[in-house]
Amino acid sequence: MEHYRKAGSVELPAPSPMPQLPPDTLEMRVRAGSKIRNLLGLALERLEGGSARHVVFSGSGRAAGKAVSCAEIVKRRVPGLYQLTKLRFLQTEDSWVPTSPDTGLDPLTVRSHVPAVWVLLSRDPLDPNEYGYQPPGAPPDLGPTPASSCGPQPRRRARDTRF
């Protein structure tokens, strides 16, 4: 492949794993270069402002982890959200062209499968029988917390055994 350079990459169209979404759903398409701060700013503004009751974070390839991170941060900041997660593989098509045209090499097309994730966060209850369903957890401020998880513990001095 040292005699080729990448000319482009196209994600082949695939049906949405969540076709039954309400029309007012905010769809956040996370890319590898997306800034989490910008994504969260818009999603939290709409959820907390009441203009959106559903938010979908979707990402594929290297952005899949970033999409999950965004959804987890939103769940911490907005308690009581129901979650539905769908995983799939999407097909991408990469085009490669020869670096020098006089080598007699042909252009290449490479198809690959990349992981993709869709995370739906909703203020309204979702179908608990659907795969990937997660009910809202208890707000983090309620309930007793174990002493071991309350932050760093003071260091104990080692006992001097010289005497």
Swiss-Prot record:
Source organism superkingdom: Eukaryota
GO molecular function, one term: RNA binding
GO annotation, biological process: tRNA 5'-leader removal
InterPro entries, per the entry: Alba-like_dom_sf (IPR036882), Alba-like_NAB (IPR051958), DNA/RNA-bd_Alba-like (IPR002775)
Start and end residues of each stretch annotated as Disordered: 1-22, 129-163
One GO CC annotation: ribonuclease MRP complex
Location within or outside the cell: Nucleus
Basic residues composition bias: residue spans: 154-163
Primary localisation category: nucleus
Gene3D superfamilies documented for this protein: Alba-like domain
Annotated function: May be a component of ribonuclease P or MRP.
Family: Belongs to the histone-like Alba family.
Protein known as: Ribonuclease P protein subunit p25-like protein
Native organism: Bos taurus
